[in-house]
Structure formats: structure tokens, C-alpha cells
């Protein structure tokens, strides 16, 4: 590449530009979790904005004369309010003018591609078709949609640039453009098939060959050339090129946009969506991403890469895994001193010709995966939340950068440990000539992506081979440049201007699915990202023997900094010979999978938002509604006092003439009868519509309650019990005693803590105390079945702690900056309070009242 100068800009391919501009964030990690400090290499320069338009507009040519403005390789921070705002806004106009010119050319290219489509379709139904309808739809797949998206974008942006002033806003246009990248995902997935189909049709049909070799592209308005001839293959590549260009422009726009400008948050969001999309698309579409040649002399390309946890010698190691066209390579980033070029160290590789996936029977014979203790994972999460709050406080108080960096380092260490120790879903691969390897993933979606990518490549005519030490060194050396995933997926690697994600509760109704070719037993699971990785949150019932399942099931999913929702559709396996005994080994067949971004503007509206996810020809319809954490923290008393939900516990017990509310006794009895061995009891969401039905029956004191309970899904019954405690107008352990519980659990001296915590129980009103002790003994019995139901005392404390303790007056916590801060400060303590009582020897109501050892003073 020629050196940069102030006289002009070097011409770069989009992929070179991508590497130059997209190496953000710390790449400094070690597989064992040690962070390394690294400075920029001496003499390094930042890369200016590059536009590769075939014809540069006069406006764009003008800005290339100076070349003094550059884009930092780190994420753009934007201009401080009022700092050179005029210059920044003028630069915005220059960037937009150049982008608009290239957008015009891109639209002309799409038009040229669409031009032959109509006549080809017209001949498809005649006796002498050039192409079949199927071939036409494959070759021109999504081109019309992409054209319409960009034409609308261009038509809206053009007048804003032409009638420029400092008040012009266009961030919403870029945000909308980014939100439509799903169309590009569909195009990219089909790209290879489209090229192969076009090539085959050219070979078999001279007429189509003539058309595809000379498509006329209209020149821009200011250009002397009216038309240029371009091949169909070259034009089909343009949409892929365009996504990267748009992302680079967003960086430039953010750099030259004041942070207090209304466009700034919209451009940030557009950039986040674009970057997520870029990291997810399959990079084998670019033939220039070549490492070395395969044994057959073909180019070896990188298809997929990412960070996975490997079980190596009974310990977990974070690896960077690279899937090439004919080999899977597992590597670790070497430790290097500051300023040195980083390199990968190859741990092992398997030629795809030798790679096999073990059968369920073979997997059973493999050593079982022992999950990390849940309470330790929860401790990590609460530490991370607390550190996030401390960092925000330091920033708000304009604290020292060293203190903030120390906190960030601690947060990275905890997030790294969580990422390393939380995955439990096994992904086993085997080299037919020797060793087996085991990765652990947190998401079945991710496992499916890796498996499908490998199996797709294995359909080709692959040969077995052994790499020489030199060949292995060359291949490993290429990984640093070729990688598409640069950073470990932890939130501490995020930039300050990136969206923190959503905190609260997402209500999702999975309505139905269609597009299945034959009847099957079908169900869906829902995954959301949390703390940087995806976890499964809910599962619909199995709809049997159908091609059009109608679930209409509602779920409440807790979000912790979440940005995406995934839906996976499975065919249920009832063949017992194929069922794996490993609880984490899902052997049901994935029929389709899809993902959507949780756009805060769309999700945070109070109304239900209905959408459709397309996956492998299958369409799943769902609706969602989001409740922010600050809203979900509020307890709302019931307006009517005849029911049980939202009514004071003392009122209910007095009306029923009972010591423990009937709803609590019946739900606990049913759980102990048939749900105490249910995996994830109280943790897994019940169907929301079932829970609402039970709520209505209990509120109406319907005589059919017992019959309905016996027929209802056990997770719905567990969910009803949780909902009852959550909707109490004041928490079971009362608002009055809440501060004292927080102080008591923080005491260091065991004897003082014992006296204080027991005294607080004695201070509770009798209905509250008796109900609490009744629930406490039940939860202990549930935890006794932990080897089967996977619910430890800590798990149960995490589920019930906030429900039993969370105060009704959240507004009193005005000193805390956000709902997320409230959560991170208080939840840890709420969980610890309940855990203290769960771990305590049995507490008798009579002995507690009789015992005079505890303090008798009022709280």
C-alpha cells in the first residue's frame, strides 16, 4: 500500500479499509484472563476516510485536497459541546456530500442489475424461457428490496444536503437504514448460491451469458460518461461492499458531530447496529481474504471465527477459533510486550475432511461437563453490576482517570471469569485420526451456527492433509489480519458512547409459525444476551403433528443490558435411543433460527409490537412489549380488596381465617407434589397466559381452583406464587424493616448479625412472619433436590430475594442515578438476606417469639 501524503489519498480496497478502521478496543487478553497494556506502534498513522466511488463528485474531490482530517482507529468520541462546532458541522456536510455521490452511483448499479430482471421474468412463462422463475429469484434475491431502501434513503437525504444549514438533522435516516440490515443478511446468505446459479446459467445459455457480461450502468449526473459496462458478478458484489462503506461513514459523521447535537445518539445507535451486523456476516464472500492455498491449489478463505471456551485437561481455556474452507484451527493470542505486533499461537487444528461430530451415544461415553457453582456465577454478576455503578459515579463526579481505569480492569477480570465459567452447552468435535475436543457454549444458537458452517463446507470434495510447520506458521500468522472478531464479548470492551442495552422485563408472545414442508412436533426457545453472552430464557410447549403451530404463549424475560432477542424453532425428538442423558446436550433438531435487535425506541413504547422472524423459509410471528426496570420495581396496590393479588397479606389471612394465605399453601403443595424435581423450578418462566388465568381464578376464589391447579403446567404454578409475592402492596418483609435488614446483613460479627437478623424476624407482623417461615421451609426442601432440579439455595435466594424484600417506594432512592444502579446496589443485599435465613438452622415461630436472647428494643 502506498504511503499516506497530504497531496492525495491512496486507493484502498474495502477490505483493507475495513481492517485499517475497524481494529477498535483492547485486543489484549490472555486465555487465563490476564490483561496486557499495549501502546500504539511508533510512527503509526490514522487512516483517513476513503471513498471508492468510480467517479468522485466535485464536493468529494474538493475535500481530498487537504487530507488533514483523519478517522481514529478507536471509536469516535464526537466533538465536545461548543468545541469547534462550526468546523465539525462543515465537515459533516463534506462527508455527507461525498457519501451522497457514492450513494447515487450505488443506486445506478442496482438499477442496472434490476433492468434485465423484468424481461427475463416475462420469458420465463413462455415456451422458450431464458431462465426459470426459480433461477431468476435466486440470482436477483433481495436486490429489489435493497434498491427501494437506498432509493428512499437517497431521496430523503439529498434535499437535506443541498439545503444545508447547522440545524439539519439526518441521524434518523441512518438509523432507519441500519435497522433494515436484515435484508442484507438475507442477501449475504444467498450470495454464493446466486453467483453459482448465474455462472451455471451463463454456461448453459448464450443469451443470458451475453446479458450478464455487459450490463449498462448509468453514470452520475456530473459525469461525462453516460454509461459504463459492468459484469453481473461485479454488480452482485456491490451490496456487500456498501455495508462496509456505510459503517465507515458513520464513524466520520460521529467524529464531526457535537455530542449535544440531536443526531449524535441516533448515529451512535446506527453504528452499533452496523458493527454488530458486520461481525455476524459470513466473510467467505470476499475472495481477497485469502490465507494460503489448500492442498488442491485452491485459495483458502476464512469463513468464520470467534471466541469459544475449550475444556482442556479438565480446565476451561478461552480460545479464538478460526474456520477456514478446509480446516478448523484453535488458537490463543500470545503475550507480547507493549508496541510489539501481536500473534496467535496454534493449539491444534483439524482438516475438515477428518472432522466428525460424535453421535449422542458417543457423547454419553465422554466425560460429563460439571457446571460452575451457580452461586459463584451470581456473585460475579453482582460484582460486575456494582463495579458498573462505581464507574458511573466516578464519571459523574469527574473522578481521576486512574481510578476509573482500575475499576474497569476489575470489571474486565470479573466479566472474563463469568464468560469463561458460565457456558455449559457442549460442542464436541472429533478428529477421525485421533483426539476429541470439547467446547462449552452458552447458546444453542451459536452451537448450531458453528455446526452448520462446518457441515456446509464438508459437502465439498475435501482432501485430508497434514500441514508442515512452515505452512502452519503461515496459516496461524494470517489469523491476526483475517479475524473478524477482534474483542472478547464483554461489556467492559464497549465504548462509553455505545448503548448500555435494556434493563427490565421483556414480555414476548410467540404466536405461530408457518413454512414447514411436513408435519412435525414443534416448539420454540427464546434467547437474550446478558453480560456479553446469550442464554436461553424461555421455551414454548410442543405443538404436535402440524405444519402450522399456533402457540400463542406469553413469557416474561428479564433483561440485563440486553440488545438482541433470538428465536430458535425445534422439532421435538421422542426417539429415546437418540436422547442424550447429559442435561445440557440438546438433541432435538433445529428447524430454523433468527435474531432481531432490541431497538430501544421500538421496544420501549407502551404498546405491543408485532414482528416476524424469517428463518430457512420458516416465518415465526411474535409480539413483544418492554417494561423498564424502574417501572417493574414499583408495587401497585389493588384497587379492589376482594381478591388476593395486590391486597395486604393481613387482610387476606383475616378474611380467610388462616395463618398462611390459601394461594401460598396451594401453590407450594402442588410444587412439592409434582414439581420439586423439575429442572429449573422457580427459575424457568411459566407461560404468562397460564399465570394470568390462575391469578384470575384465585382472585375470584373459584371453586374449580384445585382442578385447574392439577391440570396446569408446574412452571405456571411456580410463576403464580412468585407473582403473588411480587404484587403485594408492600414486601413480605415490610417497608418499615427494609433499611434494618440492609444494615443487619452488612454486619461483620456473626453473633451480632445473628441477634439482629432474628430480632428483625420477631419484629414482623404475625401473618408476614408465619408465611415467610412457611415459604422458607419449602424452599429448603426444593434445594434438597438440587442434584436433580439444579436449584441451589443461592439460586432460590436470587429468584425470591428481590421479590420478598424489594421496597414499594423506589422513588425514595432519588440519590441513585438510574434503575440499573438501584438494582446493582440493592439486589446483592436482598439476595444475601434471604440466603442467610435459608442457610440458618430451622427457625420455629414459637421459639422465635419465646426466645429472650435477642434484642428487644424497637427497630
From Swiss-Prot:
Keywords noted in UniProt: Cell projection, GTPase activation, Guanine-nucleotide releasing factor, Phosphoprotein, Synapse
Polar residues: bias regions: 54-64
Family matches, as PROSITE patterns: C2 (PS50004), DH_1 (PS00741), DH_2 (PS50010), PH_DOMAIN (PS50003), RHOGAP (PS50238)
Localization, UniProt: Cell projection, Dendritic spine; Cell projection, Axon; Synapse
Any GO BP: cell migration
Membrane spanning residue stretches: none
One Gene Ontology term, aspect cellular component: Schaffer collateral - CA1 synapse
GO molecular function: GTPase activator activity; guanyl-nucleotide exchange factor activity
Domain C2, first and last residues per copy: 484-613
Keyword Metal-binding: no
Subunit structure: Interacts with DLG4.
Role summary: Protein with a unique structure having two opposing regulatory activities toward small GTP-binding proteins. The C-terminus is a GTPase-activating protein domain which stimulates GTP hydrolysis by RAC1, RAC2 and CDC42. Accelerates the intrinsic rate of GTP hydrolysis of RAC1 or CDC42, leading to down-regulation of the active GTP-bound form. The central Dbl homology (DH) domain functions as guanine nucleotide exchange factor (GEF) that modulates the GTPases CDC42, RHOA and RAC1. Promotes the conversion of CDC42, RHOA and RAC1 from the GDP-bound to the GTP-bound form.
The record's note on its domains: The central Dbl homology (DH) domain functions as a guanine nucleotide exchange factor (GEF) that modulates the GTPases CDC42, RHOA and RAC1. Promotes the conversion of CDC42, RHOA and RAC1 from the GDP-bound to the GTP-bound form. The C-terminus is a Rho-GAP domain which stimulates GTP hydrolysis by RAC1, RAC2 and CDC42. The protein has a unique structure having two opposing regulatory activities toward small GTP-binding proteins.
Protein name, UniProt field: Active breakpoint cluster region-related protein
Amino acid at each position: 500500500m502506498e504511503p499516506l501524503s497530504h497531496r492525495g489519498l491512496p486507493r484502498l480496497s474495502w477490505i483493507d479499509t475495513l481492517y485499517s478502521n475497524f481494529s477498535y478496543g483492547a485486543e489484549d487478553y490472555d486465555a487465563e484472563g490476564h490483561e496486557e497494556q499495549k501502546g500504539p506502534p511508533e510512527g503509526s498513522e490514522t487512516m483517513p476516510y476513503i471513498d471508492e466511488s468510480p467517479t468522485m463528485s466535485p464536493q468529494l474531490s474538493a475535500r481530498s485536497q487537504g487530507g488533514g482530517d483523519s478517522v481514529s482507529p478507536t471509536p469516535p468520541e464526537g466533538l465536545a459541546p461548543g468545541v469547534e462546532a462550526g468546523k465539525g458541522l462543515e465537515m459533516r456536510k463534506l462527508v455527507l456530500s461525498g457519501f451522497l455521490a457514492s450513494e447515487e452511483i450505488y443506486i445506478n448499479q442496482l438499477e442496472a442489475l434490476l433492468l434485465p430482471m423484468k424481461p427475463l421474468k416475462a420469458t420465463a412463462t413462455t415456451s422458450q424461457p431464458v431462465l426459470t422463475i426459480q433461477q431468476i429469484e435466486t440470482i436477483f434475491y433481495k436486490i429489489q428490496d435493497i434498491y427501494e431502501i437506498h432509493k428512499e434513503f437517497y431521496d430523503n437525504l439529498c434535499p437535506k444536503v443541498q439545503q444545508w444549514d447547522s440545524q439539519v438533522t439526518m441521524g434518523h435516516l441512518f438509523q432507519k437504514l441500519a435497522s433494515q440490515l436484515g435484508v442484507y443478511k438475507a442477501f449475504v446468505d444467498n450470495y454464493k448460491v446466486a453467483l453459482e446459479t448465474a455462472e451455471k446459467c451463463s454456461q448453459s445459455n448464450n443469451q443470458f451469458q451475453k446479458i450478464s457480461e455487459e450490463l449498462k450502468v448509468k453514470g452520475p449526473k456530473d459525469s461525462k460518461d453516460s454509461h459504463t459496462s459492468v459484469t453481473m458478478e461485479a454488480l452482485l458484489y456491490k451490496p456487500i461492499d456498501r455495508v462496509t462503506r456505510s459503517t465507515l461513514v458513520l464513524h466520520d459523521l460521529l467524529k464531526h458531530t457535537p455530542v449535544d447535537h440531536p443526531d449524535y445518539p441516533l448515529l451512535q445507535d446506527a453504528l452499533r447496529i452496523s458493527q454488530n451486523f458486520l461481525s455476524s456476516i459470513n466473510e467467505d464472500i470476499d475472495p481477497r481474504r485469502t490465507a494460503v492455498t489448500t492442498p488442491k491449489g485452491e485459495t483458502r478463505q476464512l469463513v468464520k471465527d470467534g471466541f469459544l471456551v475449550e475444556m482442556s485437561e479438565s480446565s476451561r481455556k478461552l480460545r479464538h477459533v478460526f474456520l477456514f474452507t478446509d480446516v478448523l484451527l484453535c488458537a490463543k493470542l500470545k503475550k507480547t510486550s507493549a508496541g510489539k505486533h501481536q500473534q496467535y499461537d496454534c493449539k491444534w487444528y483439524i482438516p475438515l475432511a477428518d472432522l466428525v461430530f460424535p453421535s449422542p451415544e458417543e457423547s454419553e461415553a465422554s466425560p460429563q461437563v460439571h457446571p460452575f457453582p451457580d452461586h459463584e456465577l451470581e456473585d460475579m454478576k453482582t460484582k460486575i453490576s456494582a463495579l458498573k455503578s462505581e464507574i458511573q459515579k466516578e464519571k459523574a463526579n469527574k473522578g481521576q482517570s486512574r481510578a476509573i481505569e482500575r475499576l474497569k480492569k476489575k470489571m474486565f477480570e470479573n466479566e472474563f471469569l463469568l464468560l469463561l465459567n458460565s457456558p455449559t452447552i457442549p460442542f464436541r468435535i472429533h478428529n477421525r485420526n485421533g483426539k476429541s475436543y470439547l467446547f462449552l457454549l452458552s447458546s444453542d444458537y451459536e452451537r448450531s451456527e458453528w455446526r452448520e458452517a462446518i457441515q456446509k463446507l464438508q459437502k465439498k470434495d475435501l482432501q485430508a492433509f497434514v500441514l508442515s510447520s512452515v505452512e502452519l506458521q503461515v496459516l496461524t500468522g494470517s489469523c491476526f489480519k483475517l479475524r473478524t472478531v477482534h474483542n472478547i464479548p464483554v461489556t467492559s470492551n464497549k465504548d462509553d458512547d455505545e448503548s448500555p442495552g435494556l434493563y427490565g422485563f421483556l414480555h414476548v408472545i410467540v404466536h405461530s409459525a408457518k413454512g414447514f414442508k411436513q408435519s412435525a412436533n414443534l416448539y420454540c426457545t427464546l434467547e437474550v444476551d446478558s453480560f456479553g453472552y446469550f442464554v436461553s430464557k424461555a421455551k414454548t410447549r410442543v405443538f404436535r403433528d402440524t405444519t402450522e403451530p399456533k402457540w400463542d404463549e406469553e413469557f416474561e424475560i428479564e433483561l440485563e443490558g440486553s440488545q438482541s432477542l433470538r428465536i430458535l424453532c425445534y422439532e421435538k425428538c421422542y426417539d429415546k435411543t437418540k436422547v442424550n442423558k447429559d442435561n445440557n446436550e440438546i438433541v432435538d433438531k433445529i428447524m430454523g433460527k433468527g435474531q432481531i435487535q432490541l431497538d430501544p425506541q421500538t421496544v420501549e413504547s407502551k404498546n405491543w409490537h408485532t414482528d416476524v422472524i424469517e428463518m430457512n423459509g420458516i416465518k415465526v410471528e411474535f409480539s413483544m412489549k418492554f417494561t423498564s426496570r424502574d417501572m417493574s420495581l414499583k408495587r401497585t396496590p389493588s384497587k379492589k380488596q376482594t381478591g388476593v393479588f395486590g391486597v395486604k397479606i393481613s387482610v387476606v389471612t383475616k378474611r380467610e381465617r388462616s395463618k398462611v394465605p390459601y394461594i401460598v399453601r396451594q401453590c407450594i403443595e402442588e410444587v412439592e407434589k409434582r414439581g420439586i424435581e423439575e429442572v429449573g423450578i422457580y427459575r424457568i418462566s411459566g407461560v404468562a397466559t397460564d399465570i394470568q388465568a390462575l391469578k384470575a381464578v384465585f382472585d375470584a376464589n373459584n371453586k374449580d381452583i384445585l382442578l385447574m391447579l392439577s391440570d396446569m403446567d408446574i412452571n405456571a404454578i411456580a410463576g403464580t406464587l412468585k407473582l403473588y409475592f411480587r404484587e403485594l402492596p408492600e414486601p413480605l418483609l415490610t417497608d418499615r424493616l427494609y433499611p434494618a435488614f440492609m444494615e443487619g446483613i452488612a454486619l461483620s460479627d456473626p453473633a451480632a448479625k445473628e441477634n439482629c437478623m432474628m430480632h428483625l424476624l420477631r419484629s414482623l407482623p404475625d401473618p408476614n412472619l408465619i408465611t415467610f417461615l412457611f415459604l422458607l421451609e419449602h424452599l429448603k426442601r426444593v434445594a434438597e433436590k438440587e442434584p436433580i432440579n439444579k436449584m441451589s439455595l443461592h439460586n432460590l435466594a436470587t429468584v425470591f430475594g428481590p421479590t420478598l424484600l424489594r421496597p414499594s417506594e423506589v422513588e425514595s432512592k432519588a440519590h441513585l442515578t438510574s434503575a440499573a444502579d438501584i438494582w446493582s446496589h440493592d439486589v446483592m443485599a436482598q439476595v444475601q438476606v434471604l440466603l442467610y435465613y435459608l442457610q440458618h438452622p430451622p427457625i420455629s415461630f414459637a421459639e422465635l417469639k419465646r426466645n429472650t436472647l435477642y434484642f428487644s428494643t424497637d427497630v
